[in-house]
A protein has these predicted regions:
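Alpha-helical ds-nucleic-acid-binding substructure associated with the helix-hairpin-helix region
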Residues: 37-98, 102
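ATP/adenylate-binding site constellation spanning eukaryotic-like Ser/Thr protein kinases
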Residues: 7, 55, 121
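Gly/Gly-Pro- and Ser/Thr-rich, intrinsically disordered tail segments characteristic of DNA damage-repair
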Residues: 19-20, 40
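Intrinsically disordered, low-complexity, charged terminal extensions of DNA damage-control enzymes
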Residues: 8, 173-339
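Contiguous mid-protein beta-loop-alpha structural module that forms a pocket-lining wall or clamp
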Residues: 99-213
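Short, polar/flexible loop-turn hinges at active-site or ligand-entry regions and domain interfaces
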Residues: 8-9, 31, 65, 84, ...
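A short secondary-structure junction motif
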Residues: 22-35, 67-69
Length: 339
C-alpha cells in the first residue's frame, strides 16, 4: 500500500500514509488491504486524529483485518508521535515506535525519507533465496540477519535505493510468487539458480513447520428485552480489545446436551426461566496458529442476570454494529439476523 497502493510519487508529508500502509501489509496482501486502507485513512486522516481516538474506535475501524495487535500498536504509536512533536526521521527513532520492527522501520525510512535501508519482507526473502539458490532458513535469527545483510549489500546508493526496494518487493509479489511463479516470462530466469536447479518449490527454506492447535468455543447470544450482553476481551489472547457474546471455552468438542453440565455455565442459563436455542455447531474459523471450532446458542431471559463473574455491557440489538467484533462473531450475527 503506501507506495504500493497510492502511487510512487510520494512527498515527505506522506510519511503517515506510508506508516499506516506498511503496518496493514505486515499480515495482509495488497489486494485484501486496499479497501481497509482507504477506510482507515478516511476515518483517521492524520496522526493527530488517530492519537485522539479511543481504542474502541480504532479497533472498530480495523474490524475484519485481523491481527488486532497491529491496530492497538498503531494507536499507541500515534500518541508517541504526538508526544514527540512529530514523526521521527531517523531509522533508529522510527524503530522505537510501538509495533515497528526492523522491516517496517526500513520501509518507512526508505520510502518516506529516502534513507539507504534495505527493506526485507517475504517477497524479498523469496526472490533472493531463489535467484541465488540460498538454503539458509528465512525463519531463524541467523537467517534473517543473513538476508538483511545481503539485501543491504545489494542496495544501490542514492535516490535509487527506494525504487530498488520497491522493485524487488513488487517482483516477488507479482512475478516470483510463492506458488506457480511465472518463470516462463521472467526477465531474470537466465541467472536464477532455483530455476536452473529445478528447486523453485523448495526455496525459500523454512526450518520449522507451523503448529496449528484447535480451540472449542461456545458462544451464547444472551438477550434481555432487546438488549444483548457483550464482553470486551481483555486478556493477552486472540482478539484483545474486541467484543464478543458470552463465551464458554472447552478443552474438547462438547455436544449441546452436555454443555449445560460444564461448571463454567452460569446458573441462570441452566434455570427453567432461560429459553436456550442451539443455532449451529462445528463452525470452523482459521487463524494462523489456531483452528477455532464454534457452537452458537441464543439465550432469552426475562431479567438481567448479575452473576456473569466479569464486566458486561448491555447493548441494544440495533447498536451492536457500533462495536468491534471478531470476524467469526460478525458472520454468526449476520447469518442469524442478530443485529
Amino acid at each position: 500500500i503506501g507506495v504500493r497502493l497510492v502511487g510512487s510519487e510520494m512527498c515527505i508529508r506522506d510519511r503517515y500514509i506510508i506508516w499506516i500502509s506498511e503496518i496493514i501489509l505486515q499480515q495482509t496482501r495488497v489486494v485484501q488491504g486496499y479497501d481497509y486502507f482507504l477506510r482507515f485513512m478516511n476515518r483517521f486522516p492524520d496522526v493527530d486524529a488517530l492519537a485522539a481516538a479511543s481504542e474502541d474506535e480504532v479497533l472498530k475501524c480495523w474490524q475484519g483485518l485481523g491481527y488486532y495487535s497491529r491496530a492497538r500498536n498503531l494507536h499507541a504509536a500515534a500518541r508517541q508521535i504526538v508526544e514527540w512533536g512529530g514523526f521521527p526521521e531517523r531509522y533508529e527513532n522510527i524503530r522505537q515506535l510501538k509495533g515497528v520492527g526492523d522491516y517496517t522501520a526500513a520501509a518507512i525510512a526508505s520510502f518516506a525519507f529516502g534513507l539507504p535501508h534495505a527493506v526485507v519482507d517475504g517477497n524479498v526473502y523469496r526472490v533472493l533465496s531463489r535467484y541465488y539458490g540460498i538454503e539458509e532458513p528465512i525463519d531463524t535469527g541467523h537467517g534473517k540477519k543473513y538476508f538483511a545483510a545481503m539485501a543491504q549489500e545489494l542496495l544501490p546508493e542514492g535516490k535509487e535505493a527506494a525504487d530498488y526496494n520497491q522493485a524487488v518487493m513488487d517482483f516477488g509479489a507479482m512475478q516470483c510468487v510463492p506458488k506457480s511463479p511465472k518463470c516462463e516470462d521472467c526477465p531474470l530466469v537466465d541467472g536464477c539458480a532455483a530455476f536452473r536447479d529445478r528447486r523453485i518449490q523448495e526455496l525459500p527454506v523454512k526450518s520449522r513447520a507451523l503448529t496449528v492447535t484447535e480451540r472449542y468455543l461456545h458462544y451464547m447470544y444472551i438477550e434481555v428485552g432487546g438488549e444483548v450482553a457483550v464482553f470486551r476481551r481483555e486478556s493477552n489472547d486472540i482478539w484483545k480489545g474486541l467484543y464478543e457474546p458470552f463465551l464458554i471455552e472447552t478443552p474438547a468438542a462438547c455436544a449441546p446436551e452436555n454443555l449445560l453440565n460444564d461448571e463454567k455455565v452460569p446458573s441462570f442459563i441452566r434455570s427453567d426461566k432461560a429459553v436456550m436455542t442451539y443455532l449451529c455447531g462445528g463452525v470452523r474459523h482459521q487463524l494462523t496458529h489456531r483452528t477455532l471450532i464454534c457452537d452458537f446458542y441464543k439465550v432469552e431471559l426475562a431479567d438481567r442476570p448479575d452473576d456473569f463473574g466479569r464486566s458486561v455491557c448491555w447493548v441494544k440489538k440495533e447498536e451492536l454494529s457500533n462495536y468491534a467484533f471478531p470476524r467469526l462473531v460478525v458472520m454468526l450475527f449476520e447469518k442469524f439476523g442478530l443485529w
